[in-house]
């Protein structure tokens, strides 16, 4: 479980950095350089130097983070199978920039974007492999080739997206796929509404074929998951009761943790890896 947690957090960090690069707010290739690499130290120096020049050029964040820049970020996030946390971060940044942007943009822009990054948890490789394979520039170049991102937006380099991507990139196609040879045709987020919540986001890139075949293939109700809802009043309640025999949780259960949003918690609760607390020993004891 600890290894799984570290890997998932590593991918979350990759996603946040990648969104910044896709927005045009970090130097090309900066997002996924592993921390111990010499290249990380070099690009850190280049970043500091570039910030000083941007001040003299009056190149401010508001000139870079436009509506179209946020659209690019959503498309790149979808192509790499980014964390669902990216939705709240990007919407919050857009609000501070005075850009109208909400959850509906994620589905409208990103749902039909294919998964290009063969990285965990949706794929096989870790962040270091993604960096060696070409990183975000390789992803953006593939998206630009297929006319999925805006090319003429200004970035922190003072150049456009297209100008930043002119350099030839050696791409490892086992890690970074092409549009035709993708991991899945639709990798973006779905926005859901219903009697459980006013709005929610689902990351579709991690829905495996096995899960679809087992739970979402009823011909009468395609793509519908049916199960018993088990409701918890916040993360603390979840931690206290998740392994209670009285709940009779099985693979058909839907776990709901209430009050985890920015108002209820406040500031949004961290509920990543909640299923790790549901132990296999408990399941064996309950169900034999």
Predicted regions and their residues:
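Catalytic or ion-coupling anion/metal-binding cores of large enzyme and transporter domains
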Residues: 7-10, 14-277
């Amino acid at each position: 479980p600890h290894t799984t947690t570290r890997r998932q957090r590593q991918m979350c960090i990759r996603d946040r950095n990648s969104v910044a690069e896709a927005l045009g707010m970090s130097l090309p290739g900066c997002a996924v350089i592993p921390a111990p690499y010499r290249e990380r130290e070099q690009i850190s120096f280049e970043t500091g130097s570039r910030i000083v020049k941007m001040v003299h050029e009056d190149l401010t964040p508001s000139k870079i983070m436009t509506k179209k820049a946020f659209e690019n970020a959503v498309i790149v996030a979808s192509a790499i199978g980014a964390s669902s946390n990216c939705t709240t971060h990007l919407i919050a940044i857009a609000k501070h920039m005075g850009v109208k942007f909400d959850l509906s943009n994620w589905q409208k822009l990103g749902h039909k974007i294919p998964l290009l990054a063969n990285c965990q948890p949706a794929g096989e490789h870790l962040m270091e492999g993604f960096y060696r394979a070409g990183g975000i520039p390789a992803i953006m170049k593939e998206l630009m080739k297929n006319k999925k991102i805006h090319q003429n937006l200004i970035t922190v380099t003072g150049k456009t997206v297209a100008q930043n991507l002119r350099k030839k990139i050696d791409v490892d196609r086992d890690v970074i796929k092409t549009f035709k040879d993708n991991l899945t045709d639709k990798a973006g987020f779905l926005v859901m509404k219903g009697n459980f919540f006013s709005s929610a986001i689902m990351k579709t890139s991690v829905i495996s074929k096995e899960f679809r075949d087992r739970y979402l293939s009823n011909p009468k109700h395609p793509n519908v998951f049916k199960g018993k809802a088990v409701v918890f009043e916040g993360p603390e309640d979840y931690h206290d009761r998740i392994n209670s025999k009285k709940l009779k949780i099985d693979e058909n259960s839907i776990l709901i943790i209430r009050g985890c949003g920015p108002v209820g918690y406040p500031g949004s609760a961290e509920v990543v890896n909640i299923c790790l607390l549901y132990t296999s020993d408990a399941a064996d004891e309950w169900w034999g």
